[in-house]
């Protein structure tokens, strides 16, 4: 064994990074290289790479090492091995090139004390490392911006939930990047029954017309600390983000995004202003009475908003009301039905004390913040019958 082919690191730190890296891996066949992590030791850094061949993940942490080397190892096995040593503050990981194994042991404070706890995990061959390797940094990116992490995380929270979760739905499984008439970066997502439209303050000069898989945004929002900046880049084929100690890229979705502008009503005759806290409370209560259809019936009138949930099979029925001063309405008396799950999820991303609800008779429900035109959410109505 080459005794200098090792590194020492904080146990909890590497365990957390491995857990994040293996989170995108879909392949569970331990003998397949696409179930593995690529571990690269470069000077005093450990680079952890993983991919599902659509999303590419890379994180970097500081370590103690003497020699640069690469190891490809099954992600789940490596995580379990490191987790088994979580009662050690630090661990030492040695690469045995002769038998292609990683040896993991607790790092002791007393150098005279011998190691007792240790594990050995098999690794893949050098040939398999070459088959696994990928480079996401040197892509020919043609478009790049920087945005505050806090702002981008907020945009993700408001956009990602509206996209279709079924990857077979192609463009509906993505987030559409465009720009508005003022050249501000605009993001849109829809599953065909609801839609989120979010405008940023980022000015872009280039033409923007990309569809990014929503999976990467659901992954990003759990990684971002909310501090510092995010670098965002696009090429003809890839979307790339870089922040903190992470670099993440994914392949773009090919296809034409639906004409979302044609769905947005130009003018709504009926407008209401509702206390967000009271609305959340009433929705939580009426949700107990909504059946599997998820149908919520809203009755708008001058004096009150009625929320009706009913199970036609069991006969259970719940009616809850919101009145002045928590409800103001300008419009004709109207009754409409919407999916309560969509409604609850949508209002959870609003941060103001009141929410505007606008609609035309029998048409799409538009949710927005008073005097804020940067975020709009649309919900298609359900049949009342």
Swiss-Prot record:
Cross-referenced Gene3D superfamilies: 3.70.10.10, DNA Polymerase III, subunit A, domain 2
Main localization (coarse): cytoplasm
Keyword field contains Calcium: no
Coiled coil feature spans: none
GO function term, MF aspect, one: DNA binding
Protein family membership: Belongs to the beta sliding clamp family.
Function: Confers DNA tethering and processivity to DNA polymerases and other proteins. Acts as a clamp, forming a ring around DNA (a reaction catalyzed by the clamp-loading complex) which diffuses in an ATP-independent manner freely and bidirectionally along dsDNA. Initially characterized for its ability to contact the catalytic subunit of DNA polymerase III (Pol III), a complex, multichain enzyme responsible for most of the replicative synthesis in bacteria; Pol III exhibits 3'-5' exonuclease proofreading activity.
Protein name per the record: Beta sliding clamp
Organism: Borreliella burgdorferi (strain ATCC 35210 / DSM 4680 / CIP 102532 / B31)
